[in-house]
């Protein structure tokens, strides 16, 4: 599925994650080489939330409040691109992504957010949707 914005369009299936801050989104893709695998688009949190609500997408939303300003950063993560999700209650969330053919190393995303057990189980259920998933 392609998404059009006022500044361009992109294939949602090729997105690893989207970071929205102040109406601008940095979008990290699977298909570019490692030196150039992200682009900036003008997207608001509200418009992307509305899009996710209206369409069947496999993204999770995580928000962190910025410590030194009255703003927040919103992360939308493509569940199909996640290789590892760690909910470290002491520090933060660490998400490692699957490597694409073009990359030498994997991307890692750190979110300064602590999930409670229920929130973590809900995210785990969404990530595990349509996949073989075993708890040990």
Question: Where are the regions a protein language model picked out?
Answer:
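Eukaryotic intrinsically disordered, low-complexity regulatory linkers and tails enriched in Ser/Thr/Pro
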Residues: 1-136
